[in-house]
């Protein structure tokens, strides 16, 4: 008998984020959609978080599954997101996906850009 140890996920997705993704996928009527989280250059702090839906998992993507939904991250973005968590919040600023990123040394006031 052999036991397979699961490696800890390099990035987490909260229940709130998973539930919102599930709702959005249901509204789109496309069960193939996955939440793609990525990093782009820009913003007041140098890097910005991006979120989009994608039907494909590309070679090298990291896949995180939670509550029946899939989040994918490309290798270049993952290096900036390791140890982080994707959440969904609703508040006075509106509703949005957010990233808690332990690698970020500074963030802007709105939380959508960061530097390392």
Swiss-Prot record:
> Which keywords are on file for this protein?
Iron, Iron-sulfur, Metal-binding
Q: Which GO terms describe its molecular function?
A: 2 iron, 2 sulfur cluster binding; 4 iron, 4 sulfur cluster binding; iron ion binding
GO biological process annotation, one example: iron-sulfur cluster assembly
Q: Which cofactor does it need?
A: iron-sulfur cluster
One GO CC annotation, please? cytosol
Domain of life from the UniProt record: Bacteria
Q: Which InterPro entries match?
A: FeS_biogenesis, FeS_cluster_insertion, FeS_cluster_insertion_CS, FeS_cluster_insertion_RrpA, HesB-like_dom_sf
Q: Where would one find the signal peptide in this protein?
A: none
Q: Which family does it belong to?
A: Belongs to the HesB/IscA family.
NCBIfam families the UniProt entry points to: iron-sulfur cluster assembly accessory protein (TIGR00049), PRK13623.1 (NF010147)
Complex formation: Homodimer.
User: Could you tell me what this protein is called?
Assistant: Iron-sulfur cluster insertion protein ErpA
Q: Which organism is it from?
A: Aeromonas hydrophila subsp. hydrophila (strain ATCC 7966 / DSM 30187 / BCRC 13018 / CCUG 14551 / JCM 1027 / KCTC 2358 / NCIMB 9240 / NCTC 8049)
